[in-house]
Amino acid sequence: MLVWLAEYLVQYNTAFNVVSYITFRAIMALLTAMGIGLWIGPEVIRRLQLLKFGQEVRNDGPESHFKKRGTPTMGGIMILIAIGVSTLLWADLRNSYIWFVLFVLFGYGAVGFVDDYWKIKRKNTDGLIARWKYFWLSVIALIAVFGIYAVGKDTAATQLVVPFFKDVMPQLGIFFIILSYFVIVGTSNAVNLTDGLDGLAIVPTIMVASAFALIAWATGNFNFAQYLHIPFVPNAGELVILCTAIVGAGLGFLWYNTYPAQVFMGDVGSLSLGGALGTIAVLVRQELLLVIMGGVFVVEALSVILQVGSYKLRQKRIFRMAPIHHHFELKGWPEPRVIVRFWIITLMLVLIGLVTLKLR
């Protein structure tokens, strides 16, 4: 929005030309989103308390979690507001890639909102009926994927980048739709499963979004894309603004979500953030890199799949409890130790992921 205003005002004062620079707008998007999150946080928490939108806790979970019962949830609303306002202000809204990510972000946020609402109303952790939840997640993902495919099917935007191999970039064609669908829906649910401890999901999200800001900038820059042997996707550079908005909103939310949390993001936050990360990975053609950098999300999801599969096949559990962060809690690890160690692991994986861009 401000890009259009600056383009008009630059004829009167060339200083407004600074708004045309992605780096400037990226920093401003981060600061704007963070400022909004910090500003509206107390009011959002107060209203959630008045509405009695409190967290429900599994009765078979760690005893330390019982004290969390009643803590305001659905705090992801403040994340969505911060990202939405910041992006609308600082991004070039003529860029279709921005709208694809926002569509998934708010679409998944709506599904998460309904899921959270039913958990609160029923006073249990069941939420929205699973088949309806996955139906709507799938519909939203497929609409976005078909749109992305229609825009980029004749360009490098449907290539698959394989880490460590610079000359291996197969053209996916129609299979792009299948892969992209699973990346978006899978990442959304993986982040959702990770969101079980104070700050556990939001900090890895911030780290991965920060890395994707760098990757989006390189992907949208012809010279850097050639230098790194990655696909050049002309519209991708503008995603830097959205990535930094996610980082800023995440930092603003972390202020209130750090241990001991004053508010939880709920499914309205975790499903939407995961969906946004998955969509960004698809747009910059780095789906496999997301698996590396978001390794904590992947392991959390796999732990649930393995636990359920093992119990159905052998009537035995692999972990004391799934997702795996609860396993470590039941082993006696204090919650802050689990959280910080998962943060450290994510930082290492993100750095490894960024290094693979050069080691190819």
UniProtKB/Swiss-Prot annotation:
A GO biological process held by the record: cell division
Reaction catalyzed: UDP-N-acetyl-alpha-D-muramoyl-L-alanyl-gamma-D-glutamyl-meso-2,6-diaminopimeloyl-D-alanyl-D-alanine + di-trans,octa-cis-undecaprenyl phosphate = di-trans,octa-cis-undecaprenyl diphospho-N-acetyl-alpha-D-muramoyl-L-alanyl-D-glutamyl-meso-2,6-diaminopimeloyl-D-alanyl-D-alanine + UMP
Cofactor: Mg(2+)
The entry's keywords: Cell cycle, Cell division, Cell inner membrane, Cell membrane, Cell shape, Cell wall biogenesis/degradation, Magnesium, Membrane, Metal-binding, Peptidoglycan synthesis, Transferase, Transmembrane, Transmembrane helix
Main location: membrane
Residue ranges of the TM segments: 21-41, 73-93, 98-118, 132-152, 168-188, 199-219, 236-256, 263-283, 288-308, 338-358
Pathways per UniProt: Cell wall biogenesis; peptidoglycan biosynthesis
Listed Pfam families: Glycos_transf_4, MraY_sig1
EC id: 2.7.8.13
Keyword Cell cycle set for record: yes
Membrane topology label: Multi-pass membrane protein
Subcellular location: Cell inner membrane
GO CC terms: plasma membrane
Alphabetized GO MF terms: metal ion binding; phospho-N-acetylmuramoyl-pentapeptide-transferase activity; UDP-N-acetylmuramoyl-L-alanyl-D-glutamyl-meso-2,6-diaminopimelyl-D-alanyl-D-alanine:undecaprenyl-phosphate transferase activity
Role, per record: Catalyzes the initial step of the lipid cycle reactions in the biosynthesis of the cell wall peptidoglycan: transfers peptidoglycan precursor phospho-MurNAc-pentapeptide from UDP-MurNAc-pentapeptide onto the lipid carrier undecaprenyl phosphate, yielding undecaprenyl-pyrophosphoryl-MurNAc-pentapeptide, known as lipid I.
Family label: Belongs to the glycosyltransferase 4 family. MraY subfamily.
Protein name, as recorded: Phospho-N-acetylmuramoyl-pentapeptide-transferase
